[in-house]
Amino acid sequence: SDIRPGKFDFYKFMVHMLEATGTMMLAGVCHYDLHPGNILMDQNNVARIIDFGMAFDGHAIDKDTLDTHWKQLSFGDSTKNAHWISNQEPPEVTIMNAINHGYSAQDAIQQIIYGKDIFKQIAKPVLGIPLSSSMKKLEDFWKTSKSAKDKNWVSFWKSYWTAFDSWSIG
């Protein structure tokens, strides 16, 4: 795959990334920190995932896993670090993190819908999905997920960890 502008095969790159994270998931590994800075191209222009410092074993999630993986909450923060933290994780995880930091689920959902690039720059303008629709779907998810309602974060992670890296790639 040639990474020069106009030559890059985005489809092939995405297939490769999804296969890579699918393989990791089958092995029980969640990277949990996927962003452009952690994807490098090797000498053959093959994408390689690096920096597994935040990775965890999805088959062994417990309270210690969560205690070592709480991320800095970045609502209202415009630093580059906060941008990646805010955008690379699934919105459901950001809601959980916000509740852990004292926000209500409703406030967190509103911050996410109006703050995450996927909603502002892709869902609404490209896909035509109104922000109100995205907000309602997140609210509905949060109201119907047993582990979310119970604030049982270990159960929440055990249920949803397999989607964490997929969200980051998407």
Name the predicted role of every residue range.
Residues 1-12:
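Conserved structural core of kinase catalytic domains
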Residues 15-26:
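Short C-lobe core helix of eukaryotic-like protein kinase catalytic domains
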Residues 25-42:
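Catalytic-loop of the protein kinase fold
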Residues 46-170:
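C-lobe/activation-segment region of protein kinase-like
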